[in-house]
């Protein structure tokens, strides 16, 4: 990317010089992207009617698989040319001139040790419900659903890792005492009750009300995919910037970028998080599921044989639904908390 604004990377200001490139800021392309996700599923339900009861129960068994090899930062590398090396100290300069001199001010690329790191997850659901016609005017529907979301597993030793926020270590799957599920636990409190009531007060008036709870897997990466195989030691997001002042460069085009530094995995499978220089992906342990509680009450009045009026109150409450944000902030617009090394369990910032 060639740009005119200050800093190691151009911010694409159009005030000075040409702006062009193939990186995240100009015409972003996650290329090449290898993505294959599928799911095997078996579902069945049974119904039994006796008296004024209609009972249903069933099961939904799923097995999900995912392979994702991303290139958000191109695997051949993204070169950045800012105006600084051709500036007069902190003013002036031209990104295109920096490019002509071959002075690279920033560099990013994705480096993978495996292009076959896959994730698997079992999801099992069971339910039972009863529609009970109590009287000719009163009907009650009640039921319970239970959902099993197992922690995802990785297909091979060292093909995935998750950052444990409680320890500061990346749990590397299949290494040492770390299991293929990275020693993650599942949420056992996944009961989903449902109840609904309909009562006919008068021949032309009916009151209805209900409540239900449901769970979800969230956005891609919340509890499955797009996390474990996007961490070290599988994926390294290499980033190099100029550190020698306004007129310095990270390297020249003639030199080329340095090779990424290999990250050895300790024999116990606990890889210390490399610090703020690496954006490691984490999940709560045990898994935390997005939850929705919903309720409603309504009154339906028949006005004529062909016209009715319904007044309703509908409410819902979502819990743990935030898809992307720093867990360390009270305000989503604040920056993340910086933890000094002396207070870190790993001794790192």
Predicted regions and their residues:
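Short acidic-glycine motifs
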Residues: 1-349
């Amino acid at each position: 990317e060639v740009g005119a604004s200050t800093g190691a990377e151009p911010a694409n200001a159009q005030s000075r010089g040409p702006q062009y490139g193939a990186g995240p800021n100009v015409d972003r392309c996650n290329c090449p992207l290898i993505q294959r996700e599928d799911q095997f599923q078996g579902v069945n339900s049974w119904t039994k009617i006796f008296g004024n009861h209609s009972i249903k129960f069933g099961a939904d068994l799923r097995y999900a698989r995912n392979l994702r090899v991303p290139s958000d930062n191109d695997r051949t590398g993204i070169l950045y040319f800012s105006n600084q090396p051709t500036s007069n100290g902190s003013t002036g300069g031209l990104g295109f001139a920096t490019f002509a001199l071959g002075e690279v001010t920033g560099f990013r690329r994705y480096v993978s040790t495996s292009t076959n790191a896959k994730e698997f997850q079992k999801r099992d659901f069971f339910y039972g419900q009863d529609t009970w016609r109590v009287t000719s005017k009163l009907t009650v529907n009640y039921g319970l659903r239970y959902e099993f979301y197992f922690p995802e597993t990785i297909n091979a030793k060292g093909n995935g890792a998750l950052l444990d926020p409680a320890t500061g270590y990346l749990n590397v799957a299949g290494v040492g005492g770390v299991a293929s599920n990275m020693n993650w636990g599942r949420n056992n409190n996944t009961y989903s009750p449902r109840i609904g009531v309909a009562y006919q007060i008068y021949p032309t008036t009916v009151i209805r009300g209900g409540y239900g709870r449901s769970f979800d897997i969230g956005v891609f990466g919340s509890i499955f995919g797009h996390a474990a195989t996007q961490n070290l030691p599988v994926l390294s997001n290499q980033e190099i910037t100029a550190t020698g002042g306004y007129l310095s460069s990270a390297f020249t085009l003639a030199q080329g970028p340095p090779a990424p530094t290999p990250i050895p995995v300790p024999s116990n499978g606990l890889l210390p998080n490399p610090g703020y220089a690496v954006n490691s992906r984490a999940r709560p342990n045990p898994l935390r599921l997005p939850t929705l509680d919903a309720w409603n009450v309504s009154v339906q009045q028949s006005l004529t044989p062909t016209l009715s009026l319904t007044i309703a109150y509908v409410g819902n409450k979502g819990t743990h639904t935030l898809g992307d944000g720093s867990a360390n902030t009270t305000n989503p617009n604040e920056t993340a908390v910086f933890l000094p090394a002396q207070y870190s369990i790993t001794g790192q910032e």
